[in-house]
């Protein structure tokens, strides 16, 4: 599983349902395809049926689907590691994980340690991007722990669909994000 070109970047995209994860993923895939890059994608859905994989437009990608749970919990973390080990056997330039909207990334550090052990350092963690829907974020972050944990764990936070929110709401969202994660870009 040693990659002659160095470790393969591993990037996570997270955010609650409707925040724009699949749209962002499609944009990244379109850009990567234009550059001739080979991409591996793991799509995680909370339910039994994976809707997002049918929305992925790019053709030259390797897709693994993990349904009926979230990749960071014990119910799917073993399958998640297996999918990453499988993708490590392919010649890929980057692997992107689109998490379930309910994903709580708290156990990520342990998963990354297990992944390093299983793949011999094949991957290099490039961070997590959290997408925020301004219409629902302020309510969700108070009611659903996973939303708060996604913001805390992310290196980049994107407030998506800003045209749908007024200036006061955006200011409150930015303030909440800074409270939870002052180091995110």
Give the role of each language-model region:
Residues 2-14, 19, 23-140:
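Nucleotide-state-sensitive switch-loop elements of NTP-binding domains
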């Amino acid at each position: 599983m040693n990659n002659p070109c160095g470790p393969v970047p591993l990037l996570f995209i997270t955010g609650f349902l409707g925040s724009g994860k699949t749209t962002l993923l499609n944009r990244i895939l379109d850009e990567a395809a234009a550059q001739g890059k080979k991409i591996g994608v793991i799509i995680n859905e909370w339910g039994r049926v994976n809707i997002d994989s049918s929305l992925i437009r790019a053709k030259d990608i390797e897709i693994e689907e993990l349904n009926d749970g979230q990749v960071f919990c014990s119910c799917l973390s073993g399958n998640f590691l297996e999918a990453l080990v499988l993708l490590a056997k392919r010649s890929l330039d980057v692997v992107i994980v689109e998490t379930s909207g309910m994903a709580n990334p708290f156990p990520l550090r342990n998963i990354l340690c297990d992944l390093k052990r299983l793949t011999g350092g094949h991957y290099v963690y490039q961070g997590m991007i959290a997408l925020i829907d301004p219409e629902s974020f302020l309510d969700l972050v108070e009611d659903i722990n996973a939303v708060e944990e996604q913001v805390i764990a992310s290196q980049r936070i994107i407030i998506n669909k800003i045209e749908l929110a007024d200036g006061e709401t955006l200011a409150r969202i930015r303030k909440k994000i800074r409270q939870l994660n002052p180091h995110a870009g």
